[in-house]
Amino acid sequence: MALNKSQYFGSCKHTLFSCSGCNASSSRRNLLKGLGGISMLSAMGGIPAQLLAQNVTGLVDTHHHFYPPAYQKAWFDWEDQRKIPHFPQQERWTREGAIADMNKAGVQKAILSMASTPGVWFDLPLPKVVEMVRSVNDYGAEMVRDFKGRFGLFAALNMLDVPSTLKEIEYVFDVLKADGVGIQTNYGDKWPGHPDFAPIFEELNRRRALVYFHPLAASCCGRLNTGTFPAVIEVPHDTTRAVVNLLLSGTLAKFRDIRWLFSHAGGTIPMLAGRINFFHGNAKNAAMFAPNGVEAELRRLYYDTANATHPAPMAALLKLIPSTQVVYGSDYPYVAMDTQVTALSQLGLDVQVLQQIQQVNANRLLARN
């Protein structure tokens, strides 16, 4: 059974790189250039066991990507066919290298998740997608077992096929004992509040699951020529789209037992919260989607600090929500963990607030029910 993915990705021909519209190659090249000035991480192999806990201070990284071999090969093959350059830090990635970089940054535990681009589809028929998702989750669970206490897992879901997604939810929680699931902010032109996803969220709500969202640019907007690549503007904006869609669809209000975690300080939510409330807070059906008010709904969500350890976004975020709802995230390996840790520590936050963000909140969020 092959899905007609055009219904999910609009006119874009590249389901893999839906984050960058139909201009995946140039966007990827621009992104590589943009990342050139960022301190990238070296991936090391063959690290002695006695070094695996070196210089660890208890931080928990909730935004940490990984690359199972089969997945990595499928990704690179797809890029090679289209002459798209690989990310150097992704090419160098190893399990042992991730541990070494965690030790360097003082990160005790990292929660593994897939990046939204390319996701798990690769223009494959559904049975192959289901196989890819299973292999990714099995590999993540293997890392959790092999490096006890150092990794957790936000399991991947395909989302576009409800029956196989529900089956995978059962497997990752009951067999693999995953910490939660990781999903995209959109699937083509469907955001997470779409009715098609309701059965999935109903099951996740029944399990009181932790649901982590990673953004990608909408298929409509990857070719907008603003002089930069989609990761700079469109990616954080799509987190905002996802949050607003979940809010206005009533999904947040309906599924109260899901714990929701969003990347990059909620995208532009902290800056637009007042505007969202202004236009929707007094709607006739506001009690349906925001029973305690729009800002109250936004305050009960969780947000990570990935690419947001700058005074302006963190000040806006902490004005909107209590510090108990913020967790540290790095976006490794695209951004160095130690760089993010240092930037967070230099924001002048109260010591108690800093400790909450670095580890206390994440440990509470990840605690088993």
Predicted regions, residues:
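Active-site-adjacent C-terminal substructures of enzyme catalytic domains
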Residues: 236-240, 251-257, 281-337
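Active-site gating/metal-coordination segments in enzymes
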Residues: 108-109, 114-246
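Conserved N-terminal glycine/acidic-rich loop preference
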Residues: 210-213, 237-247, 252, 268-287
